[in-house]
């Protein structure tokens, strides 16, 4: 009887390891779903009274394609394409959908809506794109770079951040 249990131990370990991998893998993907991107964006938009974004598969395909191009070195260079664009880079599980959008939304502290300006020496254009009232569709992608880091690209249709225009 003891021999039978011992002979089944390798199978048990294999199955247990596979299940653990699936749980971890699912957990990582679950933190980077379309809904995760939408929730993070739309919370920021609701805070300033802007209508929610909707997910657009065509915009997401553009984001995926461009993020894949950036994977060689994770160097954040904008595509200058037809969509508005926010990029983020980070390592490991830190760079999730929610974390990327949180980084952009954190720029709100530097944005003065009354004067429609950013504090001197600060960046707030990522935030203003997130809440740009005329941007109604979004698509995002997260890709692992060759250096082990991750790049997140979110694209917005129509684009925002027009000079002299207020985002909301």
From Swiss-Prot:
The answer to whether the entry has keyword Signal is yes
* Location in or out of the cell: Vacuole
The conditions that induce or repress this protein are given as: Synthesized during pathogen infection or other stress-related responses.
Q: List the disulfide bonds.
A: none
Report the InterPro entries cross-referenced here. Answer: Allrgn_V5/Tpx1_CS, CAP_dom, CAP_sf, CRISP-related, V5_allergen-like
Q: How is it modified after translation?
A: Three disulfide bonds are present.
By its UniProt entry, which SMART domains does this protein fall under? SCP
In terms of SUPFAM superfamilies, this protein maps to:
PR-1-like
One Gene Ontology biological process: sexual reproduction
* Primary subcellular site in the record, as a coarse category: other
Q: Which residues form a coiled coil?
A: none
Q: Which domain of life is it from?
A: Eukaryota
Query: Locate the SCP domain: which residues?
Result: 38-156
Q: Which residues form the signal peptide?
A: 1-30
Keywords attached to this Swiss-Prot or TrEMBL record, sorted alphabetically, are:
Disulfide bond, Pathogenesis-related protein, Plant defense, Signal, Vacuole
One matching Pfam family is CAP
What are the annotated GO cellular component locations?
A: extracellular space; vacuole
Task of the protein: Probably involved in the defense reaction of plants against pathogens.
Tell me its family. Belongs to the CRISP family.
Q: What is the name of the protein in this document?
A: Pathogenesis-related protein 1A
Source organism of the structure: Nicotiana tabacum (Common tobacco)
Q: What is the lineage of its organism?
A: Eukaryota, Viridiplantae, Streptophyta, Embryophyta, Tracheophyta
């Amino acid at each position: 009887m003891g021999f039978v249990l011992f002979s089944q131990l390798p199978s048990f370990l294999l199955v247990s390891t596979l299940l653990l991998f699936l749980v971890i893998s699912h957990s990582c993907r679950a933190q980077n779903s379309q809904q995760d991107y939408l929730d993070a964006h739309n919370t920021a938009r609701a805070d300033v009274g802007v209508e929610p974004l909707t997910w657009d598969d065509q915009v997401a395909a553009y984001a995926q394609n461009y993020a894949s191009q950036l994977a060689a070195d994770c160097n954040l260079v904008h595509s200058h394409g037809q969509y508005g664009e926010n990029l983020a880079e980070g390592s490991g599980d830190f760079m999730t959908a929610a974390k990327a959008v949180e980084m952009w939304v954190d720029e709100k502290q530097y944005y003065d809506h009354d004067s429609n300006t950013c504090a001197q020496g600060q960046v707030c254009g990522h935030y203003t794109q997130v809440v740009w009232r005329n941007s109604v569709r979004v698509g995002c992608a997260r890709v692992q770079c060759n250096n082990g880091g991750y790049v997140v690209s979110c694209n917005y249709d129509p684009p925002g951040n027009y000079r002299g225009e207020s985002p909301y």
